[in-house]
């Protein structure tokens, strides 16, 4: 099968980051990457676009790294308390979602719910959690679940 060189416009997992030139199968490019706006075809004239995208990504990474360091200082080692409905045996009705944890963390720093790593919470108690603030920076904290 023929391969095509494409320039990624957004980060694609298991493929590359924005601005990277990658070789992919023609069908993958034509049927997925191009329609989703994740890439465009590589041409000699697109080299200038690649350089501009990489410069923009580097500038954004420096800014977000500084923000991530500040957010880590605010979050690291803290305990977030979440109240939930509990049965008499101490089990939750449902569970605690990453979105609920992100809302509870919002007074300290804005975090992406998808970046939070925590075990499934089905009972009251303290649970260790991590949040990836930047590809190189993670913060550890605790989630305390109490009865309403």
From Swiss-Prot:
This is Large ribosomal subunit protein bL9. Pfam families: Ribosomal_L9_C (PF03948), Ribosomal_L9_N (PF01281). It comes from the Bacteria. Gene3D superfamilies: Ribosomal protein L9, C-terminal domain, Ribosomal protein L9, N-terminal domain. Belongs to the bacterial ribosomal protein bL9 family. PROSITE patterns: RIBOSOMAL_L9. InterPro entries: Ribosomal_bL9, Ribosomal_bL9/RNase_H1_N, Ribosomal_bL9_bac/chp, Ribosomal_bL9_C, Ribosomal_bL9_C_sf, Ribosomal_bL9_N, Ribosomal_bL9_N_sf. Keywords: Ribonucleoprotein, Ribosomal protein, RNA-binding, rRNA-binding. GO terms for biological process: translation. One of its GO terms (molecular function) is rRNA binding. It comes from Bifidobacterium longum (strain NCC 2705). Binds to the 23S rRNA. GO terms for cellular component: ribonucleoprotein complex; ribosome. The keyword DNA repair does not apply.
């Amino acid at each position: 099968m023929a391969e095509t060189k494409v320039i990624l416009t957004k980060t694609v997992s298991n493929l590359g980051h924005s601005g990277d030139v990658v070789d992919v199968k023609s069908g993958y490019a034509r049927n997925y990457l191009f329609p989703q706006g994740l890439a465009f075809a590589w041409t000699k004239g697109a080299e200038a676009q690649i350089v501009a995208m990489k410069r923009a990504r580097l500038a954004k990474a420096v800014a977000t790294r500084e923000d991530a360091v500040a957010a880590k200082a605010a979050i690291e080692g803290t305990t977030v308390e979440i109240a939930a409905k509990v049965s008499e045996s101490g089990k939750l009705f449902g569970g605690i979602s990453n979105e609920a944890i992100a809302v509870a963390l919002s007074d300290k720093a804005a975090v992406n719910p998808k970046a939070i790593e925590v075990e499934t919470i089905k009972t009251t108690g303290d649970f260790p959690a991590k949040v990836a603030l930047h590809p190189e920076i993670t913060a550890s904290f605790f989630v305390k679940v109490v009865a309403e």
